[in-house]
From Swiss-Prot:
Transcription factor that, together with JKD, regulates tissue boundaries and asymmetric cell division in roots by a rapid up-regulation of 'SCARECROW' (SCR), thus controlling the nuclear localization of 'SHORT-ROOT' (SHR) and restricting its action. Confines CYCD6 expression to the cortex-endodermis initial/daughter (CEI/CEID) tissues. Binds DNA via its zinc fingers. Recognizes and binds to SCL3 promoter sequence 5'-AGACAA-3' to promote its expression when in complex with RGA. It comes from Arabidopsis thaliana (Mouse-ear cress). A motif (Nuclear localization signal) lies at residues 132-139. Zn(2+) 2 binds at C174, C176, H189, C193. This is Zinc finger protein BALDIBIS. SMART domains: ZnF_C2H2 (SM00355). The modification Phosphoserine is found at S58. Residues 182-194 are annotated as: SHR-binding. Residues 427-446 have a biased composition (Polar residues). Disruption phenotype: After germination, roots display aberrant divisions in the quiescent center (QC), but normal radial cellular organization. Reduced SCR expression in the quiescent center (QC). A zinc finger (C2H2-type) spans 68-90, 110-140, 145-168.
Amino acid sequence: MMMPDDHHPLSFPSYVLHQEHIAPNPNPNPNPTSSNSAKRKRNLPGNPDPDAEVIALSPNSLMTTNRFICEVCNKGFKRDQNLQLHRRGHNLPWKLKQRTNKEQVKKKVYICPEKTCVHHDPARALGDLTGIKKHFSRKHGEKKWKCDKCSKKYAVMSDWKAHSKICGTKEYRCDCGTLFSRKDSFITHRAFCDALAEESARFVSVPPAPAYLNNALDVEVNHGNINQNHQQRQLNTTSSQLDQPGFNTNRNNIAFLGQTLPTNVFASSSSPSPRSASDSLQNLWHLQGQSSHQWLLNENNNNNNNILQRGISKNQEEHEMKNVISNGSLFSSEARNNTNNYNQNGGQIASMSATALLQKAAQMGSKRSSSSSSNSKTFGLMTSIFNNKQAENIKTKEVDERGFTRDFLGVGSQHRSWPLLMVNHNLPDSSPPASTDGTPTADMNQ
């Protein structure tokens, strides 16, 4: 029973003393440089040993297949050792080169036969014969071997065989369509391709032509609709003035420039325009014509204070309309939303020069200022209101039509697709007749 107790105090101090005498080894390999120095250092390509023998071969000697030829059978061999073994078969003296420890083998280096090549310099010579052969073939030789899959050519057979094994198994395709078999080449090309794409993305792209034309067309149509709504309000104002006592109005039909147009034509004109290009362009022409007429009406209101003064009797109005239809020029107009076609009656406007018309306008202006009882000439734009065959009174704007030239009124040799102002130059000048109730009325035949 005392043995464990005696053994324990004896064994524990001895274990402690043993651990104290053991010193750790910080460097398990105390002499690593000695083993590395014993290894042979490989020279870098193009950095030969200064003590090496430099050999310069001609292109023919370098690229020849069999440099060593047997003098008996003219068989060629790549190495001299192979030739010596072949000579033994002919019972010729042969000798293999044997190396001894006493002999110092001098290292050989080869330069490229191409004078413009960087490896033609002895300081950049290549260290082995096989390496200089492949270099000359790759850089300066003919590419004889072609891949059947990708049609890529190689000058060295070993390169062609290595490529044939991996061709088509793994490829890297760029977004531009270029194929790469090597990942590093693909990454380099992809970086350049992405930079080119970012540079091209900075340029501002041209908007599509159809969308641009549609937007511009919509702006013009909306602007025309605003002008048309303004004219519609003025037309309503004129109609309200016609509702005064002494005027009997009926808005079922409106005679415009000698043409009887239903009132729904003007109502439909204020509706939203269609999206088609042809309807929109037609609407623009129609609105432009109406805007020019409205401008002429406003200008005439500023210069004439006696417009819409007297009513016209039934006989006078019927007689006036007959003269207008027989002498005036009638133009056709097509409603945009209603496909109603109106007949076009040809007419001729008296051929007068612009100077003559202006002189005539000055003369007529002096007559109006001198005589308070004289009435203005009939203005081209007439707004007559009819109800079947009943006589109606109308307010008409009277101004000398000879005071405006044909070009100014927009009445030319060509016909328009919208109603134009009609000017009658052939009506004789006469004094206004008196009505049955004694009130002077405007004679439309003036």
